[in-house]
Regions:
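Exported/periplasmic ABC-transporter solute-binding proteins
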Residues: 23-274
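Bacterial N-terminal signal peptides
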Residues: 9-17
Length: 274
């Protein structure tokens, strides 16, 4: 009987040890579509491959639902890492503090918000003033800023998007969007609509400027990759600084900042932090 109990104990310890070795940790990341649709998933895949070579299995749950979701996910502790293409708002910071959350924003890349039109459009450049006129609804026909005619279809992000707020501030002088502007869920949807509409105009992150059927307009003579480009912003990881990140989540953020991670940032047409 003693032998059987000893054998059972050995088997139990062995099974528990194997279970510990093979346990897969899942890193939950939520927020900005600008970060979460292409860039962060590609960084995550590279990180997984690196960890696998070290015998560590890691999985990711990435939800690209807008910057507001990213901020809320850190406040509500539904994600270990948030993603945002804008600074947290004062009311969000206040809500975080009320819940004991010390919101930390880590710049992991930079992005220019590109103005795109259909490739058949004759317009070759645009000014900040003209952008404001179009997206505020003051100009609704191309004849208002060019020699061509046609009713303008202006495509924007939805209100939960950080890009929506940043563009409103930097591209529209903080004016309200026009009532006829069409709100889209993500960059990909805006690019697709503009590609299919000869009178379309919209704004997207740099990862989407090579969408077939669209072209990028210089703004006041500068392209989105230029240091002088007027509609540019940092892209953030968010975390709760009052809590210690899991070792793997911390390593993932470090990997994102490493030369290998920043090479991926550049590869998907965003701008590295150095």
């Amino acid at each position: 009987m003693k032998i059987k109990n000893t054998l059972f104990s050995l088997i139990t310890v062995t099974v528990m040890t194997i279970g510990t070795v093979n346990a897969i940790e899942t890193i939950v990341i939520k927020g900005s579509d600008t970060l979460g649709a292409k860039m962060v998933p590609q960084i995550a895949e590279a990180f997984k491959a690196k960890m696998n070579k070290q015998g560590v299995e890691v999985a990711f749950e990435i939800a690209a639902e807008g910057s507001s979701t990213g901020v809320a996910s850190v406040i509500d502790a539904t994600a270990e890492i948030g993603m945002s293409s804008r600074d947290p708002k004062d009311k969000e910071v206040a809500k975080a503090k009320a819940k004991g959350v010390d919101m930390k924003a880590i710049t992991m890349a930079k992005d220019g918000i590109a103005i795109i039109v259909n490739e058949s459009n004759f317009i070759e450049s645009i000014s900040l003033e003209e952008i404001e006129l179009i997206f505020s609804g003051d100009v609704t026909d191309w004849s208002g800023i060019t020699a061509q005619t046609g009713e303008i279809s202006a495509y924007t992000r939805n209100t939960s998007s950080g890009t929506y707020a940043v563009f409103q501030k930097l591209g529209m002088n903080s004016r309200d969007y026009g009532v006829d502007s069409q709100k889209m869920a993500g960059n990909e949807q805006i690019a697709a609509e503009v590609a299919n509409n000869p009178n379309g105009i919209g704004y997207v992150g740099l990862a989407y400027i090579k969408t077939p059927g669209v072209k990028v307009l210089p703004v006041d003579g500068s392209m989105p990759e230029d240091p002088s480009y007027p509609i540019a912003r940092p892209l953030y990881y968010l975390s709760d600084n009052s809590k210690q990140l899991s070792p793997l989540a911390n390593d993932f953020i470090g990997f994102s900042m490493s030369p290998e991670g920043q090479n991926i940032v550049n590869r998907v047409n965003f701008l590295s932090i150095y």
